Regions:
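Compact nucleic-acid interaction/catalytic patches
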Residues: 105-138
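Residue-level signal for functionally critical sites in structured catalytic/ligand-binding pockets
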Residues: 56, 90, 106, 110, ...
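Active-site beta-strand-loop-beta-strand hairpin of nuclease catalytic cores
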Residues: 96-98
């Protein structure tokens, strides 16, 4: 019990722990002074309970961000996932080939209305094997210090634009999200093959993954046209110039 206590777990989650103190501070300083606002929102038919939950969590995050040390890799994952619903950042294992994938459909597409998803396709990216890909990275150099530098580049996501590192730890075996290996499934097929999520990437990290995923597919942009000429042609078509 002493060993557990020394971790700080009880200090964080105990009845008079840090979370309790922070919540009390947030309640009296940030939320209760705005009670008229929340009463007004409720009168408008807004589901204020869930909004307040999200709002309170964001306040807690603000309070702790400047006080905690650097992240450890386990913080990247939530295991078991809080929700069994299909969520952006949820990691699944295929029942057919045992490969892992991560859901990268935008959260708005995964919203359920009337028992159905807003989208008719679940977008996932395959996760390459952690050790196998690190061996490939290390094999490019002969000296150990160079191998280490190459691996460090890889896990810092500097080696290539289409790989994103997922750390290997006690919660998940890790790997590299391969943005090139994109697959889409109808929701029913996805659920049949993948079942329940194995682990969920924490929201803070999901945003970074989505940003890099979007940037990878937007990197080439659109070829330049002669926009001046095109604009003239379009204007002449919709509003022909008057001839004198």
């Amino acid at each position: 019990l002493r060993a557990v206590s020394d971790t700080g777990l009880f200090n964080v989650l105990g009845g008079t722990g840090i979370i309790e103190k922070v919540m009390t501070q947030v309640f009296w300083k940030n939320l209760y002074p705005q009670i008229e606002l929340w009463k007004s929102k409720k009168a408008q038919g807004i589901e204020t309970e869930k909004v307040l939950l999200r709002y309170a969590v964001s306040h807690i995050q603000e309070l702790i961000d400047s006080e905690v040390p650097g992240y450890i890799t386990e913080e990247m994952y939530i295991k078991p996932p809080i929700s069994q619903d299909i969520k952006t950042g949820a990691i699944y294992k295929s029942s057919k080939d045992g490969l892992f994938c991560i859901v990268l459909s935008p959260p708005c597409d995964l919203a359920i209305h009337g028992g159905k998803f807003k989208t008719d396709r679940i977008l996932v990216c395959e996760i390459a094997n952690h050790d196998e890909d690190n061996k490939k990275v290390a094999s490019k150099s002969t000296k150990r210090k160079d191998k280490k530098a190459d691996i460090q580049d890889a896990i810092k996501n500097n080696l290539t634009e289409y790989y994103h590192w997922l750390p290997c730890n006690t919660l998940f075996c890790g790997g590299y999200i391969n943005f090139r290996n994109v697959i889409t499934y109808p929701p029913e097929e996805f659920i049949a093959e993948y079942g329940s999520p194995v682990v969920k990437v924490q929201e803070y990290f999901v945003k970074n993954i989505l940003n890099r995923f979007s940037a990878y597919y937007a990197r080439q942009g659109q070829p330049d046209f002669d926009f001046k000429t095109e604009a003239t042609l379009i204007l002449d078509k919709i509003e022909p110039a008057e001839t004198t």
